[in-house]
Amino acid sequence: MSSKLERLSSSLQNILGAKVRSVVVDRGEVTLEVAAADYLAAAQMLRDHRDLRFEELIDLTGLDYSAYGNGAWTGKRFAVAVHLLSLTHNWRIRLRAFADDDAFPMFESLVGVWPGVNWYEREAFDLYGLMFAGHPDLRRILTDYGFVGHPFRKDFPVSGYVEMRYDPEQGRVVYQPVTIEPRENTPRIVREENYGDVGNG
């Protein structure tokens, strides 16, 4: 690990203290994990503390870990990951938190910290069903208004539930149940040992 990443890891531990669940450095990237209850406070500290100064939010995404890894996943299902940039210190970091409730995954909104996260949170809501308390306009952004479900969840069927088509008799687009037979898609992956140098970062 480079001295720059060591300094960042040490600063995160010292400044965030008990809020830190883990700090992992892998392949030159730092991932900071905090509890969902500490997510907003940690984000504010990452932005405002003079030794961190993560002024810019690059991206926010949802994660569904229900089919993660080689075996059955036993941890919490849903997480949110935020990618941040410190222009002051030339650092990048990934902030991750797992939702406490898999049935109703909830996080505090970061719109008050980085206003540009607004549409990213709407996207995570739309595609993963993640809720963001305090968001000023949490509604779907990519799927149709009447869309049922959240298409990036691992249990969402590949073919979906309904399909759209133009009905010339009615002169409009109509929804109907999917006409494709559902099937299980299991890709066959053959990898050599140490493929992509995984685990050696």
UniProtKB/Swiss-Prot annotation:
EC number: 7.1.1.-
PROSITE patterns in UniProt: COMPLEX1_30K (PS00542)
Protein name per its UniProtKB record: NADH-quinone oxidoreductase subunit C
Function (record text): NDH-1 shuttles electrons from NADH, via FMN and iron-sulfur (Fe-S) centers, to quinones in the respiratory chain. The immediate electron acceptor for the enzyme in this species is believed to be ubiquinone. Couples the redox reaction to proton translocation (for every two electrons transferred, four hydrogen ions are translocated across the cytoplasmic membrane), and thus conserves the redox energy in a proton gradient.
Keyword Cytoplasm: no
Gene Ontology terms for molecular function: NADH dehydrogenase (ubiquinone) activity; NADH:ubiquinone reductase (non-electrogenic) activity; quinone binding
Gene name in the database record: nuoC
Signal peptide: none
